């Protein structure tokens, strides 16, 4: 019988996660989440009827958590892409601060929590829409479309357009024309917004093997597509006013914002080379964020004005 010395045995120490709270917050894509929360809030407040403030808060919280879960699962699947892109190389997974299994578990737990909580406390119709939104973003867009087609952001944009629809369903228990209009505005806003980004980040996307439109069709075709989608966006965003769904404050603001965005888009279309072209794309990308926030802020203002008028009547 032999004696085994203690130094002959190597014990593998369990891996201790180096992730901080900030790393897990980064997995949620907080900047994207802020836009989701705001558009969802507008959808919820525009919905007819009354929803208890606690249930309203719960609805927005669940939608926000669901959006964050989608972001975490997106980063889990795209760690190889993120590592190759300057814009995303410092994210928690490529930097080794969060492991892929940790990100996957985090995303799945948050997805389950957000859907089940919304279903139990608010209604299962809204919960089903939230589950579909998460599925569409993670499976249809992230896993399938993004690496396969240059139209990834066009089709995948539906996921980003659904939060106000989910919020409306949470408040009203059903859907009508208005949430579909909100969906259409965000849906047609998404391609010019992301293609403007892709124009000045084309090298990043090419290095990562992502078939964004500037990589597959070239910058000139992308500029034309941005122009065409912006024209459609301006028309779709304005339409609710003459159709009688939103009021004059919204309609006039929509025209002003749309006109400015169209001017910036024409500038992108005209400037084809050099630093001026890159600056034009950056300006359009930045303004497009302001455009959507401002448009939905005016809708929120209309809700407040209607409430004040109703209280005084």
UniProtKB/Swiss-Prot annotation:
- Give additional notes from the record: Carbon 2 of the heme B porphyrin ring is defined according to the Fischer nomenclature.
* Record's subcellular location: Cell inner membrane
For this protein, the Enzyme Commission number is 2.5.1.141
Q: Which Gene3D superfamilies match?
A: UbiA prenyltransferase
Instruction: Please indicate if the UniProt record lists Transmembrane helix as a keyword.
Output: yes
Q: So what does this one do?
A: Converts heme B (protoheme IX) to heme O by substitution of the vinyl group on carbon 2 of heme B porphyrin ring with a hydroxyethyl farnesyl side group.
Top-level class of the enzyme under EC nomenclature: transferase
Recorded catalytic activity of this chain's protein: heme b + (2E,6E)-farnesyl diphosphate + H2O = Fe(II)-heme o + diphosphate
Please report the name of this protein according to its UniProt entry.
Answer: Protoheme IX farnesyltransferase
What protein family does this chain belong to?
Belongs to the UbiA prenyltransferase family. Protoheme IX farnesyltransferase subfamily.
Recorded GO terms, molecular function? protoheme IX farnesyltransferase activity
Kindly give the membrane topology term recorded for this protein. Multi-pass membrane protein
Which keywords does the record carry? Cell inner membrane, Cell membrane, Heme biosynthesis, Membrane, Transferase, Transmembrane, Transmembrane helix
Q: In the record, what lineage is assigned to the organism producing the protein?
A: Bacteria, Pseudomonadati, Pseudomonadota, Alphaproteobacteria, Hyphomicrobiales
Residue spans crossing the bilayer:
35-55, 56-76, 98-118, 120-140, 153-173, 180-200, 226-246, 248-268, 285-305
Q: Which GO terms describe its cellular component?
A: plasma membrane
Q: Which HAMAP family match?
A: CyoE_CtaB (MF_00154)
Q: Name one GO biological process term.
A: heme O biosynthetic process
Protein origin, superkingdom: Bacteria
PROSITE patterns cross-referenced by the UniProt entry:
UBIA
Q: Which gene encodes it?
A: ctaB
Pathway assignment: Porphyrin-containing compound metabolism; heme O biosynthesis; heme O from protoheme: step 1/1
């Amino acid at each position: 019988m032999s004696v085994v010395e203690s130094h002959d045995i190597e014990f593998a120490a369990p891996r201790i996660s180096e992730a901080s709270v900030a790393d897990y917050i980064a997995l949620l894509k907080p900047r994207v989440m802020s836009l989701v929360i705001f558009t969802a809030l507008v959808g919820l407040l525009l919905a007819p009827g009354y929803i208890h403030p606690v249930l309203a808060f719960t609805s927005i919280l669940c939608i926000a958590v669901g959006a964050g879960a989608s972001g975490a699962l997106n980063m889990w699947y795209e760690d190889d892409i993120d590592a190759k892109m300057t814009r995303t190389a410092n994210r928690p997974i490529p930097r080794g601060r969060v492991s892929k299994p940790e990100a996957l578990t985090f995303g799945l737990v948050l997805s389950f929590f957000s859907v089940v909580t919304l279903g139990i406390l608010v209604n299962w119709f809204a919960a089903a829409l939230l589950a579909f939104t998460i599925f569409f973003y993670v499976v249809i867009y992230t896993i399938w479309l993004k690496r396969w087609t240059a139209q990834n952001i066009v089709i995948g944009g539906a996921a980003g357009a659904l939060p106000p629809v989910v919020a409306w369903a949470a408040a009203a228990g059903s859907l009508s024309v208005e949430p579909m209009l909100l969906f259409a505005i965000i849906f047609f806003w998404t391609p010019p917004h992301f293609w403007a980004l892709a124009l000045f980040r084309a090298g990043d996307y090419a290095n990562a093997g992502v078939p964004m439109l500037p990589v597959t069709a070239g910058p000139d075709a992308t500029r034309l597509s941005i122009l065409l989608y912006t024209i459609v966006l301006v028309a779709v965003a304005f339409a609710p006013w003459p159709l009688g769904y939103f009021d004059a404050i919204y309609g006039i603001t929509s025209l002003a914002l749309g006109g400015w965005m169209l001017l910036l888009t024409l500038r992108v279309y005209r400037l084809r080379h050099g630093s001026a072209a890159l600056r034009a794309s950056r300006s359009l990308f930045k303004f497009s964020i302001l455009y959507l926030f401002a448009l939905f802020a005016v809708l929120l203002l209309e809700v407040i004005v209607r409430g004040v008028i109703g209280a005084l009547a």
